[in-house]
Amino acid sequence: MRHKYEMQLRKLHAEMIEMGTMIEQAIETAIKALVAQDTELAKKAIEADDAIDHQEREIENLCLKLFLTQQPVAGDMRNISAALKMITDMERIGDHASDISELTLCMAGTPYIKKLEHIQQMAKETIVMLVSSIEAYVNADEKKAKSVIEHDDVVDDLFDKVKNELITMIHENPDDGEQACDLLMVAKYLERIGDHATNISEWVHFSITGEHVD
């Protein structure tokens, strides 16, 4: 019985890794489409969100099956409960990647008013946070989970840079206001992705220690 249970837990971890990979690719595709102003790629990124939603439902079903059929002990129950919480944040990350691509479509055909280097850096940092949070969950690595939580400040600082740059540009040239607002929303979605990655790591911390992060 325990062997079967451990096999199902390994399957859960594999499905979590798969969902994490899907979301990582979604962010990368959304940013690639944004930078290149590639509308076809942006549309593909939006369509990919359905697969992420499906993966969330698959993991939900697996977690509920584990609860109902295996009677998990306290530590395993925290692990499964954390997975259910984590996939909610993961699904929201997928939504935000899709939102970025929607904005790419809105800005298509118009040259950017600024370089996107800080936005690209934000995306890289959020991907690092996401991948590390999933690794922390699968490997029960409390130290790595804490490092992700601390890393959120890096993303927040980059967001502040983008925001301040865009506000200055609006003041200097109000005609750039519409695109500046769209780019600010892109940065805001990336900042939220960082927040969701932080939430994931906080649930990882709970699954390992049984304690919530202050």
Residue ranges and their predicted role:
Residues 1-214:
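Cytosolic, long alpha-helical scaffolding segments
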